């Protein structure tokens, strides 16, 4: 049965629908939480929070948050961490991904930075692309100024959303070409599309 029809039948029958829950712990304090909280989900709740720390420190913090919430009776259906390679050492980045997965988290990583996911909404970029170029490129492509400090406005989210399927396809194409087990060497790439695909199931 179509999931939307199922949800409608559930509401008609008077049975309260149990929503899926997402815990999304992000490296950035503005851009990433703004973006994920902007998804208009009908059958899921999202707790996306930024911590201002990266790789191993972020994963340790995420584990602590999940455990603290569990003690309060909050258990999430999906747990995610979102972080960037930036200039962190290769071993730190790869170890953070492994530690997250060992503790029940899925990982949406970007090499070098989260904004690479935004760029893929417009074009397929292959090969190394330094993050210092992202803001200027995005401002040109969007037609209005973007800065990492400003976060994701509703105007920006609405500009990106219609191009989302293209971004997913571009990200998948890149990941297939790398095909290895060393994320720190996969420049430029992102697995943010994996989290986006999960969120899209609950639109």
Q: Regions from the language model: what does each represent?
A:
Residues 61-68:
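Alpha-helical scaffolding within the catalytic cores
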Residues 1-4, 8-23, 32-49, 68-80, ...:
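C-terminal accessory helical subdomains adjacent to catalytic cores in phosphodiester-
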């Amino acid at each position: 049965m179509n999931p939307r029809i199922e949800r409608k039948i559930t509401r008609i029958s008077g049975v309260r629908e149990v929503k899926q829950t997402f815990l999304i712990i992000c490296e950035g304090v503005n851009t990433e939480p703004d973006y994920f909280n902007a998804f208009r989900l009908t059958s899921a709740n999202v707790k996306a929070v930024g911590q201002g720390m990266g790789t191993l420190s972020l994963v340790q913090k995420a584990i602590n948050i999940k455990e603290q919430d569990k003690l309060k009776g909050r258990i999430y259906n999906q747990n995610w961490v979102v972080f960037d390679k930036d200039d962190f050492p290769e071993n730190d980045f790869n170890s953070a991904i492994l530690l997250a997965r060992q503790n029940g988290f899925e990982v949406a990583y970007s090499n070098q930075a989260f904004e690479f996911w935004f760029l893929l909404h417009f074009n397929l970029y292959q090969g190394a692309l330094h993050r210092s170029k992202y803001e200027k490129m995005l401002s040109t492509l969007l037609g209005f100024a973007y800065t990492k400090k400003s976060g994701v406005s509703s105007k920006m989210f609405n500009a990106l959303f219609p191009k989302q399927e293209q971004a997913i396809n571009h990200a998948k194409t890149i990941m297939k070409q790398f095909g290895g087990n060393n994320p720190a060497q996969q420049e430029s790439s992102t697995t943010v599309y994996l989290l986006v695909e999960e969120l899209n199931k609950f639109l």
